[in-house]
């Protein structure tokens, strides 16, 4: 079974480097391999909006690879239909990263195309993605208004020409995403879960989790992403379909996840969006770690979708440690209360389950 590495922090560059060191990525890559890095540059927005991959993920990945002696490195991507890839690249600072490390960036909107037979139908895929010896997928874990979640598998859609992207939507997204994952399987996935959007692919409601993941199975990574977001696999049907078509496995056992450190606080975070402010109006946060707070926000959002009534007052954060609490507490720091959700951090589904019990 594949292993997932999980790390918390605020520096995307060093977190990426540490993940790759821990996983001994250099031993996975054949000598002289051509390595293609595929981030998420869906649109011309900065990563703090929750839509695109942080430039530090890219720089950390490149620096690790170059220090290990790999030189045939490129960055490949295309923005979504209607946006300009070069503009998106500059908005995220990728032009500066590529210039610093001497790595070329290829706009896949301008790439050659090859037709590949998939379990669904023939599909047009860009040649640079297909021909890479070692494809590294660098997605953002975030919500999506049509598929509930987007991460490793859906990020591969950026390896398609625009006309094929349009077909994906006319086909309903689910089956084509699964089919693509079975024929264009990345060798490595490094997930930017630093501040992914709550529910929209294009950003605007970022939730600070300060977390990153690394794995070698995109299906397993997406299944774990569902767990982190409080979603069931059934909520994101392309994941199990991709498993059926041979893209990977959804199985995750306890020893499949290596957590490299614990979440800590100490960063200055972007101001909460209007939606997040509304969701958390009854929350009293005192020195709450970002991962714990993000799990609560996600659970509050899911509760709203279900029409659940949530407590008028919820407490969360390190300053509640050792204190008697009469309200619902979130996380181990709030264990002084009669009613609290265990975990460091607790999962969104555990918090949501408590909301259901109290309704």
Predicted regions, residues:
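N-terminal and secondary-structure boundary signal
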Residues: 1-359
């Amino acid at each position: 079974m594949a292993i997932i590495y999980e790390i918390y922090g605020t520096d995307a560059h060093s977190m990426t480097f540490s993940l790759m060191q821990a996983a001994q990525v250099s031993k996975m890559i054949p000598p002289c391999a051509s390595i293609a890095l595929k981030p998420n540059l869906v649109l011309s927005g900065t990563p703090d909006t929750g839509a695109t991959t942080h430039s530090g993920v890219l720089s950390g990945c490149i620096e690790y690879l170059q220090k290990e002696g790999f030189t045939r490195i490129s960055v490949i991507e295309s923005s979504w239909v209607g946006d300009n890839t070069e503009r998106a690249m500059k908005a995220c600072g990728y032009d500066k990263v590529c210039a610093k490390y001497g790595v070329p960036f290829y706009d896949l909107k301008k790439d050659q195309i090859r037709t590949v037979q998939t379990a669904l139908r023939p599909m047009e895929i860009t040649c640079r993605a297909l021909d890479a010896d070692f494809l590294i997928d660098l997605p953002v874990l975030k919500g999506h208004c049509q598929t509930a979640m987007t991460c490793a598998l859906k990020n591969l859609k950026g390896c398609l020409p625009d006309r094929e992207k349009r077909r994906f939507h006319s086909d309903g997204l689910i089956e084509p995403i699964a089919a693509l994952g079975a024929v264009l399987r990345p060798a490595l996935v490094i997930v930017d879960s630093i501040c992914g959007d709550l529910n929209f692919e294009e950003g605007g409601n970022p939730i600070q989790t300060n977390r990153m993941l690394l794995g070698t199975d995109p299906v397993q990574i997406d299944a774990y992403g569902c767990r982190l977001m409080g979603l069931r696999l059934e909520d994101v049907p392309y994941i199990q379909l991709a498993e059926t078509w041979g893209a990977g496995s959804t199985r995750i056992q306890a020893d499949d996840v290596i957590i490299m450190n614990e979440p800590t606080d100490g960063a200055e975070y972007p101001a909460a969006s209007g939606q997040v402010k509304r969701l958390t109006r009854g929350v009293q946060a005192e020195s709450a770690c970002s991962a714990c707070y993000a799990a609560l926000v996600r659970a509050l959002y899911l509760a709203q979708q279900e029409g659940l009534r949530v407590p008028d007052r919820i407490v969360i954060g390190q300053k509640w440690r050792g204190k008697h609490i009469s309200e619902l507490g979130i996380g181990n720091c709030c264990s002084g209360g009669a009613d609290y959700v265990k975990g460091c951090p607790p999962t969104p589904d555990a918090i949501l389950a408590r909301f259901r019990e109290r309704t």
